[in-house]
């Protein structure tokens, strides 16, 4: 049976225009700040202006006298009301989370510290909330916040990774000696050292990966309410998963999960950091109950730079041994990550550690992972979390080794790829890839970027006084995410079909792709299907949207649900067809009976729901036509992979760099909507290239102040900096199916980001190589490039 839509064509695989785009384009989206409640008041936060200190006293008297002020609340008020810290707990039994016994046995690999929404004693970073001011208007609250005086004892701080790791560094938490919250080793280091010693060429380097801000289009915003009749807190806020927010907020308020309801309207960007609750949302819920009124807050853009979770921030030391024929013999890696002031999530170091050898067959590999606390904003997953970083360091080292040996960079990579006939392949870090054709992907992208003709383009650029370079890289992902999910489907008598999902749409096109799957499997018209907003009141559990998991998880659940719906509808369809059930089958979106007598050749699912009133014995609910629920326990593994190439041109007089070309192929499995996958890959490229070329959160290491606190200082990528990307068709190798789920889905949302740092960085260094420049830290801004050129000219 090949399920098709009622219109007689498949919906899975069709580039349908996104349902949600119409309202977004018309400005009719419903974001958190668009929502208002009767009698609402407004909150703003008094924030720490130094990186670390002890609160001696908070004087709120002047603020309380200001016009329109309702209350000024402190951490002492919060604690006195019986509330506690946010518990950023691990998922029990998760075998890939450093914090669980399932990973580390009885001796946890990672330390976990809880986070007070309003600290009573010590605070740990610039921008941390110290008090909340609530007033009748937002402007009144902001003005009054300036009147709050906080008496602080300054405490010594550490800002960057090297400071935190220094032997004499101030200790941020007494439970974390040396500021170290993770120290973990993988591989046989002694064997690696022997293999390095036996290698013909050994290259090494230290590579800094910059810290980035999320830069979401929509600043964080939310409304807290308290429903006294149901004794329930209600928080409406944009996020990446309402159920995780509910759990974290409930942990802080010290109530059962059922007493917290989280609703998510439209979301203007997530990228990872919005998958974990921020303290402000806990405080909105608490203040709403305390005051008996809804409390609303919307962050400012400058406020976002000093209070939103951030991403990346690594120091990577690598050493690569290569034999004379270009075969990689050994690889040793030390990863040092800066997790910031609070241990909210360990996914980035976990991902980096698991994928350290990427797409290569390296016989001897070891790594040491160290994660440090610092007095900076917490670092959380940011698009592709941990994967771009390890690709970057290994690809840089391969280019360096190729330069040392004189071996062509593409040939050097090709001969070291994990061969297709060795799948499934277990890496030195213990990760087992299922089916990947790395050689095919790399060859495909080499054709796309016209690798063989590049030297002619370099010569032509030199004639114009320009420097031209190219970088190429295979890549591999291992998207994981929460190991559980739930979905529900309801079809009413009029055929209106509603999907309830534990995932959370924030730009991925779920309203369209989920509808395409249901339309394809059940034959329901695409236009009749809608996706409900995220709401913990609708589903008891959900995993949220992160780590390229949503379509794989929801596709699996919608497939199960469709089977359930067909099973439920079968008895009614048989009645309508006046045939025994065992003579009725479902195919092509219709029920059909062999040998029916009344001339009715087929019955649709919507015919069944319309007729259910005549057959009450088959109805599950008086209010619903057909309803089905499905739950997934455990991750659905996938290994999307591909290859990418970037080509750049540099003006040596000014350092100005132009990205001339970016090519990528990606085996994302079956694409439910190829246009949406293309869009996701485009966005991923921009975020990866944006970091390589300019994005960089800069802290003053002496004062702890963020120096890039606005878009005047923080360089966001612009459309005019990018060429037309070459994606070709979505690359799906015919013999690399994703058999872990019924729809054959892998992932595509992070593909553009994973290789971007590596291919852009190597392209820049390749362009500069005629000047003798072999090393340079990101970001590769025009200023940094010019400084490198100038320094090379002076030596």
Q: What name fits each language-model region?
A:
Residues 120, 218-223, 315, 469, ...:
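Short glycine-rich loop/turn motifs
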Residues 270-292, 296-298, 510-518:
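Thiamine diphosphate
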Residues 22-23, 146-159, 240-242, 247, ...:
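Extended active-site and interfacial segments that coordinate phosphate-rich ligands
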Residues 75-76, 96-101, 108-109, 254-259, ...:
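C-terminal catalytic domains of large/alpha subunits in multi-subunit enzymes
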Residues 14, 20-23, 95-113, 178-222, ...:
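Glycine-rich loop/linker segments at domain edges
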Residues 1-177, 202, 290:
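Flexible, low-hydrophobicity surface segments
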Residues 112, 120-122, 256-264, 287-300, ...:
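Conserved catalytic cysteine-centered active-site region
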Residues 82-88, 144-147, 215, 237, ...:
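Short acidic, glycine/serine/threonine-rich loops at helix termini
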């Amino acid at each position: 049976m090949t399920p098709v839509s009622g219109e007689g064509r498949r919906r899975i695989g069709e580039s349908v225009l996104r349902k949600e785009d119409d309202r977004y384009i018309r400005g009719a989206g419903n974001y958190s700040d668009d929502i208002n409640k009767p009698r609402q008041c407004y909150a703003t936060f008094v924030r720490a202006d130094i990186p670390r200190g002890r609160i001696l006293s908070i004087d709120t008297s002047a603020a309380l006298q200001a016009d329109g002020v309702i209350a000024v609340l402190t951490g002492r008020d919060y604690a006195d009301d019986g509330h506690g810290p946010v518990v950023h707990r691990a998922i029990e039994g998760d075998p890939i989370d450093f914090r669980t016994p399932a990973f580390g046995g009885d001796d946890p690999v990672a330390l976990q510290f809880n986070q007070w929404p309003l600290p009573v004693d010590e605070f740990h970073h610039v921008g941390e909330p110290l008090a909340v001011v609530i007033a009748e208007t937002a402007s009144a609250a902001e003005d009054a916040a300036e009147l709050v005086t906080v008496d602080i004892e300054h405490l010594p701080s550490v800002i960057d990774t090297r400071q935190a790791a220094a032997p004499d560094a101030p200790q941020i938490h007494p439970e974390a000696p040396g500021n170290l919250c993770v120290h973990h080793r993988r591989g046989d280091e002694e064997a690696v050292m022997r293999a390095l010693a036996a290698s013909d060429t050994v290259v090494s380097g230290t590579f800094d990966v910059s810290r980035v801000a999320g830069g979401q289009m929509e600043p964080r915003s939310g409304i807290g309410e308290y429903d006294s009749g149901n004794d329930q807190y209600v928080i409406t806020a944009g996020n990446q998963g309402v159920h995780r927010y509910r759990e974290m907020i409930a942990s802080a308020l010290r109530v059962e999960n059922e007493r917290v309801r989280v609703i998510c309207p439209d979301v203007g960007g997530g990228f990872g950091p919005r998958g974990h609750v921020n303290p402000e949302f806990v405080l909105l819920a608490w203040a709403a109950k305390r005051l008996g009124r809804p409390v609303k807050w919307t962050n400012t853009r400058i406020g976002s730079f000093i209070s939103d979770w951030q991403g990346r921030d690594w120091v990577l030391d690598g050493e690569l041994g290569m034999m004379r024929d270009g075969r990689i013999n050994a690889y040793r890696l030390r990863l040092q990550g800066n997790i910031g002031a609070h241990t909210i999530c360990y996914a980035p170091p976990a991902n980096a550690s698991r994928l350290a050898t990427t797409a290569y067959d390296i016989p001897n590999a070891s790594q040491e992972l160290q994660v440090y606390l610092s007095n900076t904003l917490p670092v959380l997953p940011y698009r592709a979390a941990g994967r771009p970083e390890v690709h970057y360091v290994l690809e840089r080292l391969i280019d360096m080794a190729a330069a040392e040996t004189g071996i062509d960079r593409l040939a050097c990579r090709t001969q070291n790829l994990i061969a297709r006939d060795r799948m499934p392949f277990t890496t030195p870090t213990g990760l087992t890839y299922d089916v990947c054709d790395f050689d095919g992907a790399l060859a495909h992208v080499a054709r796309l970027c016209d690798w063989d003709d590049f030297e002619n383009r370099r010569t032509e650029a030199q004639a114009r006084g320009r420097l031209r370079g190219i970088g190429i890289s295979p890549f591999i992902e291992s998207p994981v995410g929460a190991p559980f999910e739930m979905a529900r489907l309801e079809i009413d008598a009029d055929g209106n079909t509603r999907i309830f999902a534990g995932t959370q749409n924030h730009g991925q096109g779920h309203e369209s792709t989920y509808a395409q799957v249901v339309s394809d499997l059940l034959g329901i018209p695409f236009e009749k299907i809608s996706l409900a907003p995220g709401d913990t009141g609708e589903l008891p559990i959900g995993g949220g949207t992160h780590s390229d998991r949503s379509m794989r998880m929801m596709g699996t659940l919608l497939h199960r649900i469709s089977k359930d719906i067909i099973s439920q509808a079968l008895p009614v369809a048989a009645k309508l067809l006046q045939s025994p059930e065992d003579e009725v089958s479902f195919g092509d979106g219709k029920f059909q009976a062999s040998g029916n007598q009344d001339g009715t050749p087929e019955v649709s699912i919507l015919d069944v729901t319309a007729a259910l009133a005549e057959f009450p014995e088959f109805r599950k609910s008086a209010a619903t036509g057909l309803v089905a629920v499905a739950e997934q326990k455990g991750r659905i593994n996938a290994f999307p992979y591909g290859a990418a190439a970037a080509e750049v041109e540099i003006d040596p007089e000014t350092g100005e760099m132009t990205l001339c070309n970016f090519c990528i192929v990606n085996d994302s499995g079956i694409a439910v909507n190829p246009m949406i996958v293309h869009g996701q890959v485009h966005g991923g490229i921009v975020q990866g290239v944006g970091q390589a070329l300019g994005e960089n959160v800069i802290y003053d290491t002496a004062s702890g102040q963020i120096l890039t606190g606005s878009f005047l200082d923080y360089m966001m990528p612009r459309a005019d900096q990018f060429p037309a990307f070459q994606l070709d068709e979505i690359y799906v190798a015919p013999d690399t199916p994703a058999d872990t789920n019924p729809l054959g889905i892998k992932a595509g949302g992070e593909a553009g980001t994973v290789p971007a740092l590596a291919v852009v960085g190597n392209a820049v260094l390749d362009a500069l190589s005629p000047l003798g420049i072999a090393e340079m830290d990101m970001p590769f801004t025009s200023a940094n490039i010019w400084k490198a050129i100038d320094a090379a000219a002076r030596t």
